[in-house]
Amino acid sequence: MAAIGRAACLGPAGSYSELATHTLCPQAHILFFPTFPAVFDALEEGRSDAAVIPIENSIHGGVLQNLDLLEVRAAVAVAEVRLRIDHRLATRQGVRLSEITRVYSHEQAIGQCARFLDEYLPHAERIFTDSTAKSLALLDEHSAGIVGAHTRAEGVCLSPENIADEKNNFTQFFLLRRRTDGMPERGKTVFFAAVCEHRPGSLLELLTCFAARGINLTRIESRPIPSVPGEYRFFIEIEGDISSPCVREALAQARSACRTFRILGVYD
């Protein structure tokens, strides 16, 4: 694949998405966008050579919007990285917990810190924003608190401790390239989306394609299909090099067993 000169991620600067982008493509010029759909748009329209998105958190699970976008957009995951997430509570200097009436952050960050918020800020309204870094602008409100801030700014006080429910908190990020640039020919992990036939045993039939060949599943997650109430799309990650005849055979059999089947990523 071509070199990465420009990489898109969720902004503004100072987010974990920016850190993941520096990690996955350290030489790239980073372009920040306000929403995840805008990140995908930049990649598809050629304004960036690659994009970086969070896809799963070890506490809060899949980043559902990005799972849904990856399934329908013209992008494919070609690399991944897992970053340790250290969430702090940010306030203006001198603000006490009892004075905080609103807590702002991305839905994922608030979900990852639910126990702390339930215990110490049960009275505070929880308001979702597009990104944790963008929430910092809201600290002009005296009664505001921000979850997830990890960069210091003038007049901002950070909690001394990580407030996440679990201290071993990691988020997986994908490096995306345009699907038209081709799929990697090698990679020890394959990520795909599948919709099984709506009949007894169809999911078992899909999973048997891999179990019968000793191929391990490292992730399986279901998402409702909005246009078909009561039916689900499965997002599945397997351990296996896509260049292996055994893995290719399993994927081909899985494709034939499903109503729809789409490979979303091949990476190490």
Q: What is each stretch, according to the model?
A:
Residues 1-268:
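Domain-level signature for soluble enzymes in the chorismate/prephenate branch of the shikimate pathway
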